[in-house]
Amino acid sequence: MKWFEVAIKTVEEAEDAISNILYDLGANGVVIEDDEILKYPNSWDYIDENQFPKRNFAVVRAYFPESVNISELIFNIEERLKDASQYLNIGEGKIDISEVDEKDWANEWKKYYKPVEIGNIVIVPSWESYPNTKDKTVIKLDPGMAFGTGTHESTMLCLEAVQKYIKPGFDVIDIGTGSGILAIAAKKLGANRVLAVDIDDVAVKVARENAALNNVEIEIKQNDLVFGIEEKFDIAIANIIADIIIKLAKDIKNVLKEYGLFISSGIIEDRLDDVIKSFKENLLEVVEVKKLNNWCLVVARK
């Protein structure tokens, strides 16, 4: 069997949005080529950087069965990219199509996904074994088609922050939960009630599976950000993108208790000032800003 490989030339900030678009349109698998992977502290023992010429773009590759109507698919991709470009820098957005031989795209990436430690938390792929240890919080994870493996800088920053700010008994909401990794971490760190929401039904399904895998009780539901949520929480977490965080700044106080914290990440460094400005305009006190490579985390207090 042959597959169509759709390669889109983009920028790092748009990788996740474009990946989601391609999955929505029926991709059986997505691969991201990005120089930022060379910066992951736990991914490599040694790198000869001369073997990796620096590029200022990323490539998202998706794989579709040969039975797909390729003309219709390209049209739909172009339309979705046009829509995405209204709120996100997608870079060049050039689309290349080629035919490739059959491969197990859904499982190939698992060979490269290994346990990763962030502070006292260890993210362990569901198919890997890891020794039980009292001084580490182990989270078993199978991200499937949902964002959040623990290796992305924005997720690392969030995992460091939840360890710093979440106290036993806190109520926590995770907005745009993806794989459920941050909600699961919150529960394992002693949070009382944890609500995880995502607009994507695939993410909701994956998050529920990962919660069951970790034997934690988390309420997970499909929802558009905080729309319609009336409960109050000690901490709100959003690892999304800058534009959505800026949009959230107007409403986040409605779901926070007095002096509650908003932990936000997924912010590219070029958009950091915009996020901080939106927080100040909405009377949120910025209490911490942290950077990892060119990704940023901002913690604000109600």
Curated annotation (Swiss-Prot):
BP GO terms, sorted: methylation
Record-listed E.C. numbers: 2.1.1.-
Q: Where does S-adenosyl-L-methionine bind?
A: T155, G176, D198, N239
Q: Which GO terms describe its molecular function?
A: protein-lysine N-methyltransferase activity
InterPro entries per the record? Ribosomal_L11_MeTrfase_PrmA (IPR050078), Ribosomal_PrmA_MeTrfase (IPR004498), SAM-dependent_MTases_sf (IPR029063)
List the signal peptide residues.
none
SUPFAM superfamilies recorded for this chain?
S-adenosyl-L-methionine-dependent methyltransferases (SSF53335)
Going by the entry's taxonomy, the superkingdom of the source organism is recorded as Bacteria
Q: Which Gene3D superfamilies match?
A: Vaccinia Virus protein VP39 (3.40.50.150)
Subcellular locations according to the entry: Cytoplasm
Kindly give the CDD domains that the UniProt entry links to this protein.
Answer: AdoMet_MTases
Q: Which reaction does it catalyse?
A: L-lysyl-[protein] + 3 S-adenosyl-L-methionine = N(6),N(6),N(6)-trimethyl-L-lysyl-[protein] + 3 S-adenosyl-L-homocysteine + 3 H(+)
| Keyword Flavoprotein among UniProt keywords | no
**Gene Ontology CC terms:** cytoplasm
Which of UniProt's keywords are assigned here?
Cytoplasm, Methyltransferase, S-adenosyl-L-methionine, Transferase
Primary site of residence: cytoplasm
UniProt family annotation: Belongs to the methyltransferase superfamily. PrmA family.
User: Which NCBIfam families does its entry note?
Assistant: prmA
Biological role: Methylates ribosomal protein L11.
Protein name (record): Ribosomal protein L11 methyltransferase
